[in-house]
Amino acid sequence: DDRLSRGLGDVYKRQGDNIESLAVAEVDPKRGISRITIVTTGTPQVIEQIKLQLGKLVPVHKVADFMRGDKKIIFKEMALLKLVGNTSKRNKALKVCKKFNPVVLDKTQKSVVLQITALRREIDTVMGDLKKFGLVSVSRTGAVAMTRGSEIFK
């Protein structure tokens, strides 16, 4: 929705803050509802002001504050990692990523594309570790979040 995009930009322009990441996905096609996950930083007062401003935007239905480190919240990012190199390098790269259960999306004699899902800092670390094994390209999502247990965020 153009109104929401403009409003989001205006909120951040007024606050003078940056968006670290933004993830948008339709969650209820029948009602035309999407979930937007915005990752930003700021003092508690700045975050509260951003929440208030976002809540005033039409057609925003609900605004919630999911704090990093909150054990009741699951945070994840997804990354696609392309590596170019010989079989030995690719196998070593897979071992580096093993704890994140990498999915091999594409594999040739000279390259491999992996998908991993992890916390932002874990992906940052893996990317650093993979440079010596031929990491040549990265595409990653912004963070997404969901509450644990039976609590529903509507």
Task: Label every PLM stretch briefly.
Residues D1-L8:
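Single conserved hydrophobic/aromatic residue that forms the stacking wall/gate
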Residues G9-R35, V39-K154:
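Long, contiguous binding/interaction regions
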